[in-house]
């Protein structure tokens, strides 16, 4: 089993600094929140999917520290009773799945 850190707990830090903390803890992997009710501070799937250079930099930030991505965590409700919220959550869930491919 590998230990990892859910980076949303470090959302007040820029991505690089958050990953430095994770690396200093000696863990091997990171989980990223990707939207819904969670933060997209470190991993915004829509932004990463529409900008290949940004996606490459994101990967390098993680892999360059010897870390791996163990999970993309979407916390939302695509069946939310408020249609506007449901549509946003559906889009964010879809983008999370596409990013995971």
Task: Label the predicted regions.
Residues 1-101:
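N-terminal pre-domain/capping segments
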């Amino acid at each position: 089993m590998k230990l990892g850190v859910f980076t949303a707990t470090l959302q007040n830090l820029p991505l690089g600094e958050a990953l430095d903390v994770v690396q200093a803890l000696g863990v091997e992997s990171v989980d990223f929140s990707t939207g819904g009710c969670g933060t997209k501070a470190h991993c915004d799937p829509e932004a990463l999917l529409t900008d290949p250079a940004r996606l490459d930099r994101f990967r390098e930030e993680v892999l360059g520290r010897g870390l791996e991505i163990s999970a993309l965590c979407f916390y939302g409700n695509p069946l939310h009773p408020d249609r506007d919220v449901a549509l946003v959550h559906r889009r964010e869930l879809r983008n999370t799945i596409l990013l995971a491919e």
